[in-house]
């Protein structure tokens, strides 16, 4: 549709959906999403942060005349969602009742099916005729997440149930992040992806940012030239040497042209976005700890690291001046059975269609033991190993209670963050709660942690915009309207383009009054800069695949050359043994 057509559609849909005294108007992208939903019967919305997904979520039930609508949101956004509904129902004809569940609760054992007791799952018990997935990227983990398994089983069993899924970050690095969600939203004849798993896996290997599984890396995307729909696609394919990028662009056009798929293709926010790297130097004591970490893969308390992911995580913590210590340290007699059992559970969930939680795997193994005791079934070697694994874990499980405490080596990074916060109103973003708690206790800053609340239970939205605050990335990094601030300092940049897009969108969004939004991130070790590089690679992939403008690519990057390099152990590679 042209811009004028979209404006006409917004006026028309507003008149049909507003209350007699309503004064709000649908945005063109909201009107288009609701129109596609009504026409196709489902919606796959790749809608940028701040596009108005909440209103679409509520009006979806009105448009489809749903009798039993269900809205699924992250737990931290429940209160905000209820508040928004009270405001929006003054202007639009929202459903009188819309059941709200959270991804967190839906993934718990209580929400699952219990065949022994004849208990239905939470989804089957409510039996919604419409499921709205807000922040739908929470349902992307196809193989392992219990909530995804339960949603998948529900849609297979209830073919007439409709689905509207929306997110500004629908994918992270793979087509597999959203392929299953597409099948819930659209009828089979409209799907822009293969429905056969093996063929979809080949597409994934050709298109994905990173592909690692079964020893197979990315494959040549040449076969996807068949996706070229017109002369423009063909010219793009012929002009570029980067066939993988061309395949992503061609796929993106195929995706966004599919009926029922709506994607924002522009970012009309007036404020510019500037991303800066802030180099932070630490004490000689931290460098000494880093030297030991790099050389021996060992924390100061003697705890050894097993893989590169652990090194990446602990190095980023240490570069902020602390490390996490088991207090007390778990005995090997407890740790090894726990490790073995968790490895077995992960393997079982990955290959099972019926089991979707650790407790269900435990019950399944318990049933094996019962069959063996009554001689109803002879156990094979694999079954016996499962029983032995569980027995070994249950024998020691309650003998130790895990507990970690932060050990501080240096507070230079925190002092710099506090000085920054006291010189301008802004948000200091932290990943680990202990960092936020110390900034609160030692430097006098308000810290909004779990559920976006401070120690007095005040919501982050109610904080004085003239004062700085510290916010948890996990609790407030998505779904919050924080455009009252335009300055950001991130102490621990997420190494994910999807998470960073959400984080940038808290302050760089509609309603921002400042001319510029500044987002600084701390670089005090090599891993901090690697997180930035990975996020950049992710955002290029996301924009190429979905066409949704990514803030990281629209921003001005004031990142000095060499900011991620230096002398000393904080900048060594993990296999280096000398300076």
Predicted regions mapped to residue ranges:
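A conserved SF2-helicase RecA2
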Residues: 495-504, 508-579
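Walker A/P-loop NTP-binding motif
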Residues: 35-41, 53-67, 185
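Conserved pre-motif I regulatory segment
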Residues: 2-44
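Conserved helix-turn-beta segment of the N-terminal RecA-like "Helicase ATP-binding" lobe
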Residues: 76-98, 185-188
């Amino acid at each position: 549709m042209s811009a004028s057509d979209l404006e006409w559609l917004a006026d028309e849909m507003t008149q049909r959906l507003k209350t007699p005294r309503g004064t709000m108007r649908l945005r063109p992208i909201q009107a288009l999403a609701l129109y596609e939903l009504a026409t196709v019967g489902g919606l796959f919305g790749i809608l940028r942060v701040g596009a108005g997904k909440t209103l679409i979520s509520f009006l979806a039930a009105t448009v489809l005349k749903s009798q039993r609508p269900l809205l699924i949101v992250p737990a931290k956004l429940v209160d905000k969602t209820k508040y928004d509904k009270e405001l929006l129902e003054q202007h639009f004809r929202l459903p009188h009742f819309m059941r709200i569940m959270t991804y967190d609760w839906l993934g718990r054992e209580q929400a699952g099916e219990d065949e022994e007791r004849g208990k239905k799952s939470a989804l089957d018990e409510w039996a919604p005729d419409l499921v709205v997935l807000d922040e739908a990227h929470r349902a992307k983990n196809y193989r392992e997440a219990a909530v995804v398994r339960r949603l998948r089983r529900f849609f297979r069993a209830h073919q007439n149930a409709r689905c509207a899924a929306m997110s500004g970050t629908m994918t992270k690095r793979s087509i597999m992040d959203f392929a299953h969600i597409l099948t819930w939203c659209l009828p089979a004849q409209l799907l822009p992806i293969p429905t056969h798993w093996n063929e979809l896996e080949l597409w994934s290997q050709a298109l994905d940012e990173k592909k690692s599984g079964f020893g197979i890396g990315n494959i040549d995307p040449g076969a996807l030239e068949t996706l070229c729909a017109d002369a423009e696609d063909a010219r793009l394919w012929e002009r570029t040497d980067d066939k993988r990028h061309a395949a992503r662009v061609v796929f993106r056009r195929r995706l966004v042209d599919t009926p029922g798929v709506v994607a924002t293709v522009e970012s009309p926010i007036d404020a510019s976005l500037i991303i800066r790297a802030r180099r932070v130097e630490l004490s000689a004591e931290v460098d000494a700890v880093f030297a030991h970490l790099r050389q021996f893969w060992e924390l100061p308390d003697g705890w050894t690291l097993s893989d590169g992911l652990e090194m990446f995580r602990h190095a980023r913590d240490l570069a902020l001046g602390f490390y996490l210590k088991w207090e007390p340290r778990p005995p090997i007699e407890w740790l090894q059975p726990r490790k073995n059992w968790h490895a077995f559970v992960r393997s079982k969930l990955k290959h099972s269609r019926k089991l979707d939680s650790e407790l269900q795997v435990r019950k399944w193994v318990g049933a094996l033991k019962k069959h063996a005791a009554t001689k109803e079934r002879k156990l094979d070697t694999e079954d016996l190993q499962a029983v032995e694994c569980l027995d070994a874990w249950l024998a020691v499980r309650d003998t130790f209670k895990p507990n970690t405490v932060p050990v501080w080596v240096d507070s230079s990074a925190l002092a710099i963050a506090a000085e920054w916060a006291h010189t301008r109103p802004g948000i200091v973003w932290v990943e680990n709660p202990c960092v936020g708690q110390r900034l609160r206790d030692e430097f006098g800053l308000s810290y909004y942690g779990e559920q976006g609340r401070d120690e007095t239970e005040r919501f982050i939205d109610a904080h004085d915009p003239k004062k700085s605050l510290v916010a948890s990335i996990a609790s407030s990094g998505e779904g919050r309207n924080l455009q009252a601030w335009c300055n950001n300092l991130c102490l621990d940049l997420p190494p994910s383009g999807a998470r960073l897009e959400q984080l940038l969108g808290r302050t760089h969004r509609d309603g921002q009054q400042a001319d510029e939004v500044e987002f600084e991130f701390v670089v005090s070790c090599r891993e901090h800069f690697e997180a930035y590089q990975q996020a950049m690679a992710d955002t290029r992939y996301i924009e190429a695949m979905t066409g949704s403008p990514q803030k990281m690519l629209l921003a001005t990057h004031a990142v000095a050359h060499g900011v991620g390099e230096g002398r000393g152990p904080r900048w060594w590679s993990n296999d280096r043994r000398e300076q």
